[in-house]
């Protein structure tokens, strides 16, 4: 029974292989797209428009762009990346005159707060619960570590991420594809690439924060110390990028 359950476990990760035209019989570059997902997780679609969109590949529920696939000139696929794209900041909370602040260097900054109302079903009745949400400049308060409120920092540019995913499907060569990667909102994936000109490439991650390496970001860091803050993002060229390896 345990063996059967293990065989039915959800797949993890994916495989992608780009082969240079120098190594193929046809002389064309080849791209293997092998996402390890459950059977119904992604459907295959052909997206065509009169304005020139012409892409085929896999989409996840609700996506209007081809997540991994190809158009007439380029092909792209993604594997799950182990690049560190998320950190936790322990905040020092101070309450003054009924208002919440957090320590940041020598200053006290106000904690941002909003309220959220969620509706839920209780038997046949619909009920709702309203509760506060808090955040600092590091990100939303998501949990406590050592009895300290802890903010989770991550890529949160949903519109830019959507733009990058759509723009990716319209590129006709490496130059445009490489420029698209400069948007740097693909936070969870590596990218394997091939095109009709014979180019192949591998991009390890895309959204990679710059950090002070004197701190251990594998654990929550002290959010009151400005030195722990992210210092922007690494450029695509600063990350691992392999183009046409010999």
What do these predicted ranges mean?
Residues 1-246:
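Mature extracytoplasmic enzyme cores
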